[in-house]
Amino acid sequence: MIIRETLSYDDVLLTPRYSDILSRKEVSLSSFLEEGIMYQLPVISAPMDTVTESSMAIAMAAAGGLGVIHRYNSIEEQRRICVEVLSTGDPACAAAIGVTGDYLERASELVEAGVLTLCLDVAHGHHSLMRSAIRSIKSKFDVHVMAGNVATKKSFEDLADWGADSIRVGIGGGSICSTRMQTGHGIPGFQSILDCFRADIKRDVKIIADGGIKTSGDMVKALAAGADFVMVGSM
């Protein structure tokens, strides 16, 4: 039984339209994530141990984007990497933590080091552990909380209600993450963005498209569907 038809990035093309823009240099895709910090490039590198450490985070900042330092290391090593990134003078530094174990200790060390965004990094974000973690982090630290991953309007609304400031939308379907294929759960990425953009929430919670983005055209489609930022691990 088909519950409903959904759209993936491959199912969609944007219609070419008339323009009076004289140069691509005139186009701005800049967006805020944390309060007061404008990103010229709405792209975030994924918190994977093969993707984002100091060199990638520094390069992303130089390009106008953001890198999220992965959590698959010791607290001391993750803090050291973040300090190295911040030493370049760019205030934008994000780092991933979990929702169990040492996550509060890790969060404390990272915030003390100057990290402005903590990414609560789990495969299935619509979970009681995520709710507890978001509320604990927000009650203890003055920090932007990026949470996820989710794929439905209801899950987006719940994470926003729990206190998340930005939410990663997308379950699997990426070049590395295979959650959708391994578990049989998920919604095509383009559809997830459309649904979450229509969420009934009372404040500005940023949508981060994550997963299933294979080309620069997919990034454009994600932004057109309502995403504020796009997260990628490879392309």
Regions found by a protein language model. Give the residues of each.
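Non-catalytic, soluble scaffold/interaction modules
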Residues: 43-46, 67
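Alpha/beta enzyme core
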Residues: 3, 12, 51-210, 214-235
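An N-cap/entry alpha-helix motif that binds or orients negatively charged groups
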Residues: 1-43
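Generic, well-ordered alpha-helical segments
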Residues: 37-40, 48, 52
